[in-house]
Amino acid sequence: MNLEERVMELESRMAFQDDTIQALNDVLVKQRREFDHLQQQMAAMIKRQEEMGSQFDTFEEDAPPPHY
């Protein structure tokens, strides 16, 4: 393999690596957006659960024990 062939091979590999890096970056950006969205949904669900839990806590405190 002469020098020119080696340079062409390296340039080819570099182009392939650039494409791969760009594809990986695109996937990473997409996953980050999905992660942020899931975090927002989780925060909303936790808030809703806490609100619902506080509603049930007041109901249970007012109810007499089951043995009465």
Curated annotation (Swiss-Prot):
Top-level taxon in the UniProt lineage: Bacteria
Name of one Pfam family that matches: SlyX
Signal sequence range: none
Protein family: Belongs to the SlyX family.
HAMAP family per the UniProt record, alphabetical: SlyX
The protein's name in its UniProt record: Protein SlyX homolog
Gene assigned in the entry: slyX
